[in-house]
Amino acid sequence: MKLAILSCSPRCYSTRRLVEAAEQRGIKAKVLNTLKFAIDLAEGEPDLYYRSKQLSDYDGVLPRIGASITYFGTAVVRQFEQMDVFCANSSAGISNSRDKLRSLQILSRHQIGIPKTTFVRDRKDILPAIERVGGSPVIIKLLEGTQGVGVILAENVKVAEAIIETLQSTKQNVLVQQFVAESRGKDIRAFVIGDRVVAAMRRVAVGNEFRSNVHRGGQTEAVVLDETYAETAVRAAQIMGLRVAGVDMLEGTNGPQVMEVNSSPGLEGIESATKLDIAGAIIDYMSAQVDFPEVDVRQRLTVSRGYGVTELHVRDGSDYVGKTIDESGLPELDINVLTLYRGTTVIPNPRLKRTLEPHDRLLCFGKLEAMRGMVPEKVRKQRRPKIKRLPDSAATIHAESSRDD
């Protein structure tokens, strides 16, 4: 396997360890500076140039994209995806993980435990927002920030209001988030590779610091996660579209509360705390998965006229409740169930004899017209109205205004 590691920091611990682990396994790994790429596009010929030379073929790509170059970095990863090269983390997953609001929206939609969070712009909404997340003390976060930068603890409402107003006056977007008191100054970092947690550590802040990030002097200790925490970490990473991720969780009274899913987790802290070869585990995973590059299903299916992918909900009282997928008539309608979601359980490629239950969600591929007819009329989205022609008088006004310009 020929591996490319995308990184602007070839001498940092994580990059050096990945190269070392690859070489120990007889794998040729090269560190490529993400900012030295040029993306070329032509009909049917997506291509990449590196330092002004056409890039040679690589079997796999391990992105280590810094937050400051997210846009360009994800564009490079996306180009590798278009060229059918396996990428450890998808471009979409990296982009989603960098946007704190977007990532929490995705996790919330999939019933992952998160601290109560609100996002406001109007000054009049600030106080009600603080109350909705549980009142003071409250956490205030900038939408973009890493290693604890841009995270503020406001001990009372007046201080919180002043901080939010000040940040908004400088055109900053901020999140207002519940302060999980029982987890003050500590959190858990679970390192996910593929479909399992390979290592986990607890990070504890020093002194009066409430942020437990290692870069802020936080101390670490290895921990063994119970099934609930491990399952939450894996689901969070997979939902975000990340095969290699650091999932940060608070230890709440109601179970794990996911704060963030990191697409470029550092290796030094987790390897030092656990004494495990995490870099080697990443390389081993890539070796096993390199023949299965990311496929943009929706993009591929746009050429299938009249067909598409959608999610069907089995509602209370539906005729499908109690029937198997086979008995539901979906196969006869040329509708294939790709995945069944039941609560927090994901059932890929479910058997036709699987019985449907209320609140099941079915990810289906088939004829759009047939699937549209299965959505109850009261929840069905209205079709887009036809665009009407402007009256002649309006067209005349437009022509005159154009001449004035």
Swiss-Prot record:
Report what the protein is called. Answer: Probable alpha-L-glutamate ligase
At which positions is Mg(2+) 2 bound? E260, N262
Provide the residue positions that the database annotates as binding Mn(2+) 1: D248, E260
Tell me the ranges covered by the RCK C-terminal domain, including all copies: 296-380
Cellular component GO terms, alphabetical: cytoplasm
Gene3D superfamilies given in the database record:
3.40.50.20, ATP-grasp fold, A domain (3.30.1490.20), ATP-grasp fold, B domain (3.30.470.20), Regulator of K+ conductance, C-terminal domain (3.30.70.1450)
Which residues of this UniProt protein bind Mg(2+) 1?
D248, E260
Q: Cross-referenced InterPro entries, in alphabetical order?
A: ATP-grasp (IPR011761), ATP-grasp_RimK-type (IPR013651), ATP_grasp_subdomain_1 (IPR013815), RCK_C (IPR006037), RCK_C_sf (IPR036721), Rimk_N (IPR041107), Rp_bS6_RimK/Lys_biosynth_LsyX (IPR004666)
Q: Which GO terms describe its biological process?
A: potassium ion transport; protein modification process; SOS response; translation
**PANTHER family this protein is in?**
BETA-CITRYLGLUTAMATE SYNTHASE B-RELATED (PTHR21621:SF0), RIBOSOMAL PROTEIN S6 MODIFICATION PROTEIN (PTHR21621)
Pfam assignment, any one: Rimk_N
Name of the top EC class for this enzyme: ligase
Q: Does the keyword Mitochondrion apply?
A: no
The lineage's top-level taxon is Bacteria
Keywords from UniProt, A to Z, are: ATP-binding, Ligase, Magnesium, Manganese, Metal-binding, Nucleotide-binding, Protein biosynthesis
Q: Which cofactor does it need?
A: Mg(2+); Mn(2+)
Q: What is its EC number?
A: 6.3.2.-
Spans annotated as Disordered? 380-405
Q: Where is the ATP-grasp domain?
A: 104-287
